[in-house]
């Protein structure tokens, strides 16, 4: 009997030891798994923060239309815009082609309305390059201030047609070439050429498009975006259409841009170009970052994929910017407001139950001097108001 109890006690003890060891093993694996998870959350440099931005449901717009209106929060990129993706792709492609070598006094030159320049300047700080940015003088001062803070050489250029050698893009191209041949300047210049560089649309085909598809679990009816260089709408549309050709792609275009008529009628034309109304600089809008009056290589990729287009007025963009702040706490820039106006128009056209995806491109903090400046707006004959409904968006 004593041996029986002794064996039982021994068995219980062994079982206790086994359970103790099993628990220790479990805890060690849990700690290791937790440590591994933490390690995976560490990225290498600011470039590692680019992409995988959140998708946000814009509650007020969704509730008002009965559609699921989602927006990719691209302002959450470290440079606060989707241009981070483009800048990184252009620089990496240039490195692969031997056009850029880090820490050799090489400089990246670009002509930009601001956001791409900010992304380039930010990445040049991290990747070992200088940055030289040429931007139109009518763009918000906030952007040039950020560029200078990031160490970029900034030149604000008087707006001019693209055929003018002093156009900001042509100025950037010319100075990049001069840098390379001038032996008195160390290193060489690389012209990023975002309007024509295929790395632009490829950045969105490789990252933004797949992210949208994954975040929506492949369930979306339409995608809406504006176009400046054309790279964003080209890359995302090309990816989404490759997954589901039935997805509707819609262009949101501001006043003065010829893309609206190019999509609808095949002619690059704006009403401002009518006989008797021509001006030296046709694009006359408070909206920054989208709208153009020429075909770019990147937009040529997008054009056959775009199914429809909406013209969005400055007044509508201003009203939407205030509406989003008041009803959703979303403080966004002018191109984002344009996108949201177009999203509501399309939602009204499609009817309840559809899912529409667009982009929130940059924060409102870059637009204090124009979009959120009441004095500036009144000079443009725009009276900023906080709308209580979406009646300012026609169906």
Curated annotation (Swiss-Prot):
* Recorded topology in the membrane: Single-pass membrane protein
Q: Which InterPro entries match?
A: Cys_Synth/Cystath_Beta-Synth, P-phosphate_BS, TrpB-like_PALP, TrpB-like_PALP_sf
- Give the protein's cofactors: pyridoxal 5'-phosphate
Q: Which Gene3D superfamilies match?
A: 3.40.50.1100
| Domain of life where this protein originates | Eukaryota
Q: Which GO terms describe its biological process?
A: cysteine biosynthetic process from serine
Disulfide links within the chain: none
Q: Which CDD domains does this entry report, sorted A to Z?
A: CBS_like
The family database entries (Pfam families) matched by this protein are listed as: PALP (PF00291)
Q: SUPFAM superfamilies this protein is in? A: Tryptophan synthase beta subunit-like PLP-dependent enzymes
The protein's predominant localisation is mitochondrion
The residues that cross the membrane are 6-22
Record's function text: Putative cysteine synthase that catalyzes the conversion of O-acetyl-L-serine (OAS) into cysteine, the last step in the cysteine biosynthesis pathway. However, in contrast to cysteine synthase cys11, this CS-like protein seems not to function in cysteine biosynthesis, at least under normal growth conditions, although the transcript is produced.
What's the protein called, per UniProt?
A: Cysteine synthase 2
Taxonomic lineage of the native organism: Eukaryota, Fungi, Dikarya, Ascomycota, Taphrinomycotina
């Amino acid at each position: 009997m004593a041996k029986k109890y002794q064996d039982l006690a021994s068995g219980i003890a062994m079982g206790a030891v086994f359970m103790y060891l099993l628990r220790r093993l479990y805890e060690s694996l849990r700690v290791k798994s937790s440590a591994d998870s933490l390690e995976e959350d560490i990225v290498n440099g600011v470039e590692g923060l680019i992409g995988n931005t959140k998708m946000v449901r814009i509650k007020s717009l969704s509730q008002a239309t009965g559609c699921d209106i989602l927006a990719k929060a691209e302002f959450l990129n470290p440079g606060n815009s989707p241009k981070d993706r483009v800048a990184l792709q252009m620089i990496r492609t240039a490195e692969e082609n031997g056009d850029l070598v880090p820490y050799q006094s090489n400089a990246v030159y670009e002509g930009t309305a601001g956001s791409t320049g900010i992304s380039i300047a930010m990445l040049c700080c991290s990747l070992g390059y200088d940055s030289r940015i040429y931007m139109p003088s009518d763009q918000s001062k906030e952007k040039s201030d950020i560029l200078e803070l990031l160490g970029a050489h900034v030149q604000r250029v008087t707006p001019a047609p693209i055929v003018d050698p002093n156009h900001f893009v042509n100025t950037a191209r010319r100075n990049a070439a001069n840098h390379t041949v001038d032996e008195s300047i160390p290193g060489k210049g690389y012209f990023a050429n975002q309007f024509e560089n295929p790395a632009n649309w490829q950045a969105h085909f490789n990252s933004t498009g797949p992210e949208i598809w994954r975040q929506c679990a492949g369930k979306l009816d339409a995608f809406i975006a504006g176009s400046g260089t054309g790279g964003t709408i080209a890359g995302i549309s090309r990816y989404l259409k490759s997954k589901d050709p039935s997805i509707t792609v819609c262009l949101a275009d501001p006043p003065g841009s010829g893309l609206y008529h190019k999509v609808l009628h095949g002619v690059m034309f704006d009403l401002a170009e009518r006989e008797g109304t021509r001006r030296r600089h046709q694009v006359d809008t408070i909206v920054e970052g989208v709208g153009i009056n020429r075909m770019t290589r990147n937009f040529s990729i997008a054009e056959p994929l775009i199914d429809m287009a909406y013209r969005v007025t400055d007044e509508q963009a201003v009203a939407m910017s205030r509406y989003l702040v008041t009803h959703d706490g979303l403080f966004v820039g002018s191109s984002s407001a344009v996108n949201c106006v177009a999203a509501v128009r399309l939602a009204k056209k499609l009817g309840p139950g559809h899912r529409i995806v667009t982009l929130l491109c940059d924060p409102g903090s870059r637009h204090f001097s124009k979009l959120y400046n009441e004095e500036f707006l009144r000079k443009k004959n725009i009276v900023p108001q906080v709308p209580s409904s979406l009646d300012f968006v026609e169906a």
